[in-house]
Amino acid sequence: MICYNKYGDWIRKRFGCKVQKISIDAGFSCPNRDGTIGRGGCIYCNNATFNPEYCTDTAGRVSQEERLNLSADNIRRQLETGKEFFSRKYPEMKYIAYFQSYTNTYGDIEALKRLYEAALSVENVIGISIATRPDCVSDELLDYLEELSHRTFLTMEYGVETFNDDTLRIINRGHSSECSINIIRNTHARGITVCAHLILGLPGEGREEILRQVDIVNSLPIDILKLHQLQITKGTILEHRPDLIAQCTLFTPEEYIDLLVEYIPRLRNDIVIERFTSQSPAELLIAPRWGLKNYEFTNLLEAHPVPPKGRVPPPLPPQGGVVSIFD
């Protein structure tokens, strides 16, 4: 059986109760879409694939300034809607406001403060988690976040995606691995909990490269790790780039488990793993189509026997079953 430091257990031990993250869309945009850093965004990104139904996606309909000014009440509404949904089963549950959609530090600092404080004003919200790009957190904002972390539970979730600079260029990420490393270290130095998000199976990254990067993860002050398999979804650049898809590893569940049973034991045992997979809506997902919910995959992984030492894992297929996309 695979053992690891589970996020659910870690957060429950920290607060002494069941805690649920509620995803919210605060109306942010992305500097890799609007021309500040780049245009078009990352090749795999379709924000609709991870937005819950209770989130209101305002991106693109009004200006960035208007979105942020309108969002404080909207944030409270989304949190109350999320609370209503989860409290039916767990009335005593506490909540973390998860700023998930797009780049949640991309805006005027005073506007950002209003949004974060609005979330914390909601009853039974005991902390916030802020997802953002490694190149979108200023020293001024870190000063505020450091102060905020003394008042509430705060996690900064950085979309690192990979530590390979060649891959970062291919996926049009718009930042370097050095940028990711520096912000992780700087955030940790402020006493703020750091979460790193990585995608496994990006163009050119097979088993060997994925496992190589575990050493980089272990060398950095990362508290929480979020992993997920690469998925090709509608409305993305990657959907229309069969040349890049051919360089990706589109795992089957069995192949992904086989990778993770080697990946997990290599991690520092103090690193908390929050998730292993992403589950895009069926109507948007092109490949790979697993037909599994996240918890179902995790159950399969946890039941998998630990591989014996010295075992050489079978090689992954070079195209991960990509051809079926175009049949």
Regions found by a protein language model. Give the residues of each.
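Hydrophobic faces of well-ordered beta-strands that scaffold small-molecule active sites
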Residues: 20-24, 95-97, 128-130, 154-158, ...
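Auxiliary Fe-S-binding modules of radical SAM enzymes
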Residues: 2-9, 13-20, 53, 224, ...
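Canonical Radical SAM [4Fe-4S] cluster-binding loop centered on the CxxxCxxC motif
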Residues: 15-74
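Acidic (Asp/Glu)-rich catalytic clusters
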Residues: 86-88, 116-123, 143-153, 185-189, ...
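Core AdoMet radical
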Residues: 49-82, 86-109, 124-137, 153-179, ...
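Conserved C-terminal portion of the radical SAM core fold
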Residues: 178-238, 254-277
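Distinct, well-ordered alpha-helical segments
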Residues: 109-117, 138-147, 210
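Structural recognition of alpha->loop->beta junctions
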Residues: 118-125, 212-227, 297-313
